[in-house]
Amino acid sequence: MSNSHPYASFQDVSLEYPNGTIGLSKANLSINEGEFIALVGPSGSGKTTLLNTLAGFVHPTTGSVSINGQVVADESIFVPPEHRHLGMVFQQHALWPHMSVGRNVEYPLKQTKTPQDERRRRVNWALKLVGLEGFADRNPSELSGGQSQRVAIARAIVAQPSMLLLDEALSALDEPLRESLRLELRHMTIDLGLTTLHVTHDRGEAIALADRIVMLDHGHIRQIGTPDDLLNRPADPIVASFFDDATLFEGQCDNGIFRTHKPSFHIPTRLLQTEDGMPEGPGTLVVLPDAMTLVEDSIWRENTAVSPDMDTSSL
């Protein structure tokens, strides 16, 4: 469970690539200490760009990025990745094939000139934490895909970072293994108090793991909220369609009645769930799958408040 202290933040962060493509557009996000945040969205939405901006792999065009109260990137400041004290795991675990498991895991510690005895202790601790105790002398070629990803996770946490970045870290694994690692990963981040930013294309994974979810589309943050918020109170049709395969009806709201264009029906706005009431004018009706039931036409006409024509006298 997270507390209210922001550990990382993005303030009006925009990123434009040299070819003119917009990676991010005025992104604002505060990540609380100990919080597990999932970044979701379609391909090209900006979720990996947001993570890479925090990691220090790209420099934002405008805006600022802060970690633990320190600005690490703005128009004049740029702290390189190796000085941001972040652990990172990617879709491809990228273990060095010529190094043993133990040497792979200890690599970040050698870069910081950690004493050998302390390196050995931390490597054993990290491997035990991911369920690979006794694997230090094995070669990567002897490992399964799941074991290799566990080694990558051990390497990411061995230097005891205060924040963990995951970029599709589980997506290359088979579903039964992914499910198992999801649970272990969540328990581990809670036990270690790690603030976590997790990029995933899997809606179910985001819902299962995250304290809050950030939905992006074309570089814009569409909504930030709990899994329940995005499932049951989507901010717009894009969020609704991504999370729940919602059916969308374009229409017009007039005098307390929402009338759709095609197919044509109308419904009193008092029956609709809205954040701040239903404003007059054009809009989109979002119907979630579990809100629909198929019934016989005669039963529907007798019991529904939704009418298939424009006659409102029965409403």
Label each residue range with its predicted role.
Residues 40-42:
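The feature captures the beta-strand-to-loop junction immediately N-terminal to the Walker
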Residues 48-51, 151:
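ABC ATPase nucleotide-binding domain helices that frame the ATP-binding cleft
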Residues 262-315:
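Glycine/charge-rich catalytic "coupling/switch" loops of P-loop NTPases
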Residues 85-87, 91, 95-238:
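ABC ATPase nucleotide-binding domains
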Residues 2-10, 14-26, 75-79:
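A short, flexible loop at the N-terminus of ABC-type nucleotide-binding domains that lies
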Residues 55:
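Helix-to-loop junction immediately C-terminal to a conserved catalytic motif
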